Amino acid sequence: MLPLVALVGRPNVGKSTLFNALTLTRDALVHDQPGVTRDRHYGVCRIDGQPLFAVVDTGGMVGKEDGLAGATARQARLAVAEADVVLFVVNVREGASALDDDILAWLRKLSQPTLLVINKIDGVSDTTVHSEFAHYGFSDVVPVSAAHRQGLDDLIEQVLAWLPERSIGEAFNEDSERIHIAFVGRPNVGKSTLVNRLLGEERMIVSDVPGTTRDSITVDLERDELRYRLVDTAGLRRKSKVEEAVEKFSAFKTLQAIEQCQVAVLLLDAGEGVTDQDATVLAAILDAGKALVVAMNKWDGLATYQREQAEDLLSRKLGFVNWAEVVRLSAKHGSGLRELFRAIHRAHVSALRQFSTSEVNKALEIAYQTAPPPSIRGHVSKLRYVHPAGSNPPTFIVHGTRLKVLPDTYKRYLENFFRKRFKLVGTPVRFLFREGDNPYEGRKNVLSERQIQRRRRLMRHVKRK
């Protein structure tokens, strides 16, 4: 399971800015006005695409208006109860306040490890930073400037040292032979019905009321001599619709299931098409870099013209993930299930494929010769060599020069070329671009004695002229 880190503190200390900096997103609303964040929401801290831990941002706890027993404080308490490590965020420019003292007193009653994060240190002397909160008696203090990303590496290092020794990979090590599949989508599209149909029993509660499934439920299945682990998740809804505390936790469990799976099945309602909520779920899958199968449920209930409309809408809304296979099925009646498992298997094989350095360099050479990078303001990027850097998703590191000006269109060309050449289906393909250092930079050419004598003769000849 992905470890969880909670950000707690009074309003306007920079928790949301720190959340955005750790997750490399702008998911948390940032404003100088205190109290902008009311609810808690989740993200994932990654390095080079690899997830390290989940982060939960909470609303600022206001003393007079809410009190520690108010609605915002309840959200903070729930976040802390879920968390493995708590980051107590304070503002060095405003110094310690009575509300900071109250929050600290509450945190000290809990069992979770707590780090003191002193934010907004830019422009503040080191003496002030270390003395302002010294009376709190923390042994682990990390000064940062979230807005300028100062001190974040030290913070991440401290957090990792405090987290329990577990990782996403442990979920697979329990049964590495099983294909881990997460069924995700917005509420009431038929995820539980589909899992029940696959299992041949009423394992999941099924209802017409959206949100019946509140937690991620894991079951094992063997089919066609292959072993699977199925995860039925709670539906991800728009943030404005997620109100109950238990439902917020369900959303986090769904994000965890996406992080831990090997193949994500995005279930859509064929009659309603692709909605904004579906796009939100898809974004979480793509952000995690997981293999993807799109399943159009309730296909049997559509007339011919409705199916044509659904196909047209799908191609327009999801054209940017045309590498994912689309399966038309009916969870209620069981049609299309064999095609679903075939698509899952193809996506899984593609996502975990291993590549040799020689074959990917041959592919890069052919791609480069077929369509060289365009000239940008008189500069042309040069791609020297590539090597595989991992799987699930397949990742390649390209080395060269002037790669910062390499257009996004050419990067997509490389992705499509590699996908077609290696017959990769149902999985993202990632490229990382590294500009090589000049190996001769800073080195002085050492002349031999013969070269020195020759240079002297030339210089005397020049002077006589």
Curated annotation (Swiss-Prot):
Associates with the 50S ribosomal subunit. Residues 3-167, 179-352 form the EngA-type G domain. InterPro entries: AAA+_ATPase, G_ENGA, GTP-bd, GTPase_Der, KH_dom-like, KH_dom-like_a/b, P-loop_NTPase, Small_GTP-bd. Transmembrane segments: none annotated. Keywords: GTP-binding, Nucleotide-binding, Repeat, Ribosome biogenesis. This is GTPase Der. GO terms for biological process: ribosome biogenesis. It comes from Xylella fastidiosa (strain Temecula1 / ATCC 700964). GTPase that plays an essential role in the late steps of ribosome biogenesis. The keyword Repeat applies. Belongs to the TRAFAC class TrmE-Era-EngA-EngB-Septin-like GTPase superfamily. EngA (Der) GTPase family. Residues 353-437 form the KH-like domain. One of its GO terms (molecular function) is ribosome binding. The keyword GTP-binding applies. GTP 2 binds at residues 185-192, 232-236, 297-300. Disulfide bonds: none annotated. It comes from the Bacteria. GTP 1 binds at residues 9-16, 57-61, 119-122.
